[in-house]
Amino acid sequence: MEIPRRFCICVLTFFVFVLLSPTTVHSIIRHYKFNVMTNTTKLCSSKPIVTVNGQFPGPTIVAREGDTILIKVVNHVKYNVSIHWHGIRQLRTGWADGPAYITQCPIQPGQNYLHNFTLTGQRGTLWWHAHILWLRATVHGAIVILPKLGVPYPFPKPYKEKTIVLSEWWKSDVEELINEASRIGTAPSASDAHTINGHSGSISNCPSQSSYGLPVRAGKTYMLRIINAALNEELFFKIAGHVLTVVEVDAVYTKPYKTDTVFIAPGQTTNVLLTANANAGSNYMVAATTFTDAHIPYDNVTATATLHYIGHTSTVSTSKKTVLASLPPQNATWVATKFTRSLRSLNSLEYPARVPTTVEHSLFFTVGLGANPCQSCNNGVRLVAGINNVTFTMPKTALLQAHFFNISGVFTDDFPAKPSNPYDYTAPVKLGVNAATMKGTKLYRLPYNATVQIVLQNTAMILSDNHPFHLHGFNFFEVGRGLGNFNPEKDPKAFNLVDPVERNTVGVPAGGWTAIRFIADNPGVWFMHCHLELHTTWGLKMAFVVDNGHGPDQSLLPPPADLPKC
C-alpha cells in the first residue's frame, strides 16, 4: 500500500521537531583534570604560588545545565588541598562539595580525588576555589554554566561573553602571613594589590608586565561575568563612560538593573550587559577598588584594566586618550546599599521566585568578632569570631562522614537557634566586655524539606564590619535587610516575599541585619560561613545537618570509593 506523501512529510517534520527540541537534547559528561601545582610568578615580584594547571586565575569550567562534571583533582604540592565548587547545589552529592573537614577530608600530597556532580536546574556564572588554609588566594577560577541547547537567555543575546575575575595579591607568602598572625592572635597585613584577570594594572603600586585589555566593537553588546575571588575585600567595579545592566547574580536571573557601579562581595558573581556605545576614539579605564566602612587596615590600591574599541586591530592603542573612571569613595556605604537594595529576582513564568511564605525554623544568628584570653598573644587576647557567641572548632574527621556513618564524638547538633543572652547588638562594646566566646563543633539539625528563616544580625563587638555569608548546598532569598537591631514585630511586615533576590552569598551590613529564607531540600552537611577568609579563620562559621527524607530520591548518596582519608 502506498503511503500518502502528506503523511510522510508530517511524520518527518515531527521527528525533526523532536530531535531539535531542547527537552530531547541529551546532557553530556564533561571531564576535567586539575593539577594543583607550584609555579613562579613575576607579578609584583618573583615568588612561588600554588595554582591549578599553572594558571592564575585557574582554568574555566564550561558546561551546560544538566551536564555531569567529572573533575580529577591531583595534589602535587606540600599542603593538604580541597576545592569547593562555589554555588553548585550538589543535590544529594555533598561528597563533591569540597570544604575540608566538612564534606571530605583534604586531599593529601601525592593523592587525588574525583569530584562527580550534575548541574541540576542551574545556569549562569559560579566559581571554584580552594577551601583549606588561605590557598584560594591563587587557587580559583570561573564556572560558566550555559543554558540547555535551544533555551535562550531572558534578555537579548550578547555579541560575546567575557569573564572578569577580581582578586587580591600579596607580595609575601600568604600562608606564612596568616600563620604568624594566628600565632600572635591578630590580623595579618592587608594585600598589596588587587587584580583583574591576574593583572594589577598600570596605576597600581604593584605593576605587572601588562594590564588586562577588554576589546569591544562599536555598537555591540557584551556580557561580562564578574567574580569577586578576593579573600577579604568587598569591591566596587566600574567602566568609565559606560552603563552596565545587571541581569544575573550568583547564577540566578534578575530583573534588569542599570548602574554605573557594581558592588560585589567576596564569593559573589554578577553578570552585566555592556553596550559599546561610547566614543571609539578613546580608551576607557576599567577599575576595581575596595569598599569598607569599618575602621580597619585595608588594601587601598585600585586595580585597573583598559576597555578599547577595535576595528582591524585587537591591541590597545597607546596614542588614544584614556578616560578615567570616577570611583566612589572607599567608604561609600550609600552606593553599596543602593546597589544591593535594587536587585530583584526575575520572577517570570520560566524562572519563578519560589519564596517560602511560611517558616518552620526561625533562627536568629548574631555574627561578629570577639576576643578570648591568650597568654602568648599580643595584649593577652586572641581575636576570634562567632555566631551566637560560638566560635566554630574545625573537626579532625569530615562532618559528612561522621553524619553518614553515625560516628559519635565528632560534632553535636545543639547549635543555638538564638543568642543565649540578648543585648543591644549594635551598640559599641569595649574590648574585654562580654567579648569572650565559647568553642564548639556545633551543628543545627533540620528535617528534610523544612522551611527556614535566618536573621543574620551584625554586632558591634570589637568593631562593626560587613560580613558576606555563604551557604553551601542551597540558594536562598534575601527577604529583608535593615540597619540597627532587628525588630521581630515590625521588620517582617516589610519583607519582600514576591521577588526578592535569590543568591548563595549575601552581605550583612555593618550595624545592621539581613533576613534570608530557604527550603532544606538537600540532605547532607552544609557549611555556612563568612566569606571574608580572615573571619572564617577566626571561627565565623557553622554547619547545618539536613536529614534524609522519604525514599532514595530524598536521601544522600553513599560516598565514593576514592573519598580522601584524614
From Swiss-Prot:
GO MF annotations in UniProt: copper ion binding; hydroquinone:oxygen oxidoreductase activity
Superkingdom classification of source: Eukaryota
Enzyme Commission number(s) of this protein: 1.10.3.2
Glycosylation site residues: N39, N80, N116, N300, N331, N389, N406, N449
PROSITE patterns: MULTICOPPER_OXIDASE1, MULTICOPPER_OXIDASE2
Tissue-level expression: Mostly expressed in roots at low level.
Coiled coil: none
Residues engaged in binding Cu cation 4: H467, C530, H535
Sorted UniProt keywords: Apoplast, Copper, Glycoprotein, Lignin degradation, Metal-binding, Oxidoreductase, Repeat, Secreted, Signal
GO process annotations (BP): lignin catabolic process
Residues annotated for Cu cation 1 binding in this entry: H84, H470
Gene3D superfamilies: Cupredoxins - blue copper proteins
InterPro entries named among the record's database cross-references: Cu-oxidase-like_N, Cu-oxidase_2nd, Cu-oxidase_C, Cu-oxidase_fam, Cu_oxidase_CS, Cu_oxidase_Cu_BS, Cupredoxin, CuRO_1_LCC
Location of the protein in the cell: Secreted, Extracellular space, Apoplast
Family of the protein in this entry: Belongs to the multicopper oxidase family.
Function: Lignin degradation and detoxification of lignin-derived products.
Record's protein name: Laccase-16
